[in-house]
């Protein structure tokens, strides 16, 4: 597993592990590193089958296998407790760890995640799969921003969109890996177990998310035993990239506050 450590390097520094979504790249969190670096040791990593970790996504195990990769990183860093922030699929990884190893996670942050995939999200993934299988990698990568960002933001960041597209094609994780990762997030379902998770959790959702209806975030906040809901009107699926200052402020307020488990 390829991972990087940023921010504080003191042995006693609080650690937060950041886990990205379907793309799997640790570089997704670039807009958060500086803001978190004054308070935390930050661990970012490339998911198995992606980026500098590479390799193949396991045929079995689903989200739990991806969570085991995080536990491997924690063991290598000798972490007995850490905070965890996950975007979409990364949030599912955090929920899995919170269920199986609750003693490890101090605080949990979920960004446009879910306890059970919404039918609308399934429709979006069907479209993306069809693009990949019928039109190829370039079409799949070209369509990806439509599910991540608001239209006005894409218009204002056209050069970035073009650069991201070139990078996405050049470093594509492979059709088999993408399909297995999509299958894992679609199969994830802990909806009837949410109340078992007592980890203090910040649930971040955006009303203009095209891929994941914000009602999935509402469901998480209602079902978890110690959750705070932070809804935004603007920012779409990748709200931490689109509105980093507002997002980072919410996250830091939550992480710095004393926990009150209800």
UniProtKB/Swiss-Prot annotation:
Q: Output the NCBIfam families linked to this UniProt entry.
A: RutD
* Recorded name of the encoding gene: rutD
Cross-referenced HAMAP family? RutD
What role does it play?
Answer: Involved in pyrimidine catabolism. May facilitate the hydrolysis of carbamate, a reaction that can also occur spontaneously.
Annotated PANTHER family = AB HYDROLASE-1 DOMAIN-CONTAINING PROTEIN, HYDROLASE, ALPHA/BETA FOLD FAMILY PROTEIN
Provide the GO MF annotations for this entry: hydrolase activity, acting on carbon-nitrogen (but not peptide) bonds, in linear amides
Matching entries from SUPFAM superfamilies are given as:
alpha/beta-Hydrolases
EC number, as in UniProt: 3.5.1.-
Alphabetic keyword roster: Hydrolase
- Gene3D superfamilies for the chain: alpha/beta hydrolase
Give the family, as the similarity comment puts it.
Belongs to the AB hydrolase superfamily. Hydrolase RutD family.
Q: From which residue to which does any coiled coil extend? A: none
Its EC top class is: hydrolase
Q: What protein name is recorded for this chain?
A: Putative carbamate hydrolase RutD
Q: Name one GO biological process term.
A: uracil catabolic process
According to UniProt, the reaction catalysed is: carbamate + 2 H(+) = NH4(+) + CO2
């Amino acid at each position: 597993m390829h991972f990087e450590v940023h921010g504080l390097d003191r042995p006693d520094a609080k650690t937060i592990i950041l886990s990205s979504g379907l793309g799997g790249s640790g570089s997704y969190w670039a807009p958060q590193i500086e803001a978190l670096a004054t308070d935390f040791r930050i661990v970012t990593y490339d998911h198995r089958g992606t980026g500098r970790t590479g390799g193949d996504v396991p045929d079995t195990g689903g989200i739990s296998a991806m969570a085991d990769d995080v536990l491997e990183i924690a063991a290598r860093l000798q972490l007995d407790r850490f905070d965890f922030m996950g975007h979409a699929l990364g949030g599912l990884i955090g929920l899995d760890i919170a269920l199986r190893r609750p003693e490890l996670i101090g605080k949990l942050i979920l960004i446009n995640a879910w306890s059970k995939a919404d039918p609308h999200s399934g429709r979006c993934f069907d479209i993306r799969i069809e693009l990949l299988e019928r039109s190829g990698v370039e079409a799949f990568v070209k369509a990806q921003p439509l599910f991540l960002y608001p239209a006005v933001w894409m218009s204002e960041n056209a050069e970035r969109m073009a650069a991201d597209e070139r990078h996405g094609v050049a470093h594509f994780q492979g059709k088999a890996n993408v399909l297995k990762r999509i299958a894992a997030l679609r199969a994830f379902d802990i909806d009837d177990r949410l109340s078992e998770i007592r980890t203090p959790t910040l649930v971040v959702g955006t009303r203009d998310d095209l891929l994941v209806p914000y009602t999935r975030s509402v469901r998480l906040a209602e079902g978890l035993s110690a959750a705070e809901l932070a809804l935004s009107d603007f920012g779409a699926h990748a709200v931490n990239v689109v509105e980093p200052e507002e997002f980072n402020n919410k996250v830091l307020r939550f992480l710095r506050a004393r926990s009150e488990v209800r």
